[in-house]
């Protein structure tokens, strides 16, 4: 169930401060964050945000189409390596 519109977007305060500081200074270094739950807002457009996926920080370049989505959607946490192959078919 999506978040109610009357509540507005959620963004962690520490991330908001980092984003405002990066926009103000014009810094192009990625903004590191562990806050996967924060929503992407228009202030973040053009920034690279390094989102933690549980093992490392995945760089995410924010574009207009991403507004309203959560940061965690763009940093996958699981790696899919495929199903186990049939051993008999492999030998041939």
Swiss-Prot record:
A GO CC term attached to the entry: small ribosomal subunit
A GO biological process held by the record: translation
Gene Ontology molecular function: rRNA binding; structural constituent of ribosome
Keywords for this protein: Ribonucleoprotein, Ribosomal protein, RNA-binding, rRNA-binding
Family: Belongs to the universal ribosomal protein uS19 family.
Reported function: Protein S19 forms a complex with S13 that binds strongly to the 16S ribosomal RNA.
Family annotation (PANTHER family): RIBOSOMAL PROTEIN S19P FAMILY MEMBER, SMALL RIBOSOMAL SUBUNIT PROTEIN US19M
Protein name in UniProt: Small ribosomal subunit protein uS19
Organism: Aeromonas hydrophila subsp. hydrophila (strain ATCC 7966 / DSM 30187 / BCRC 13018 / CCUG 14551 / JCM 1027 / KCTC 2358 / NCIMB 9240 / NCTC 8049)
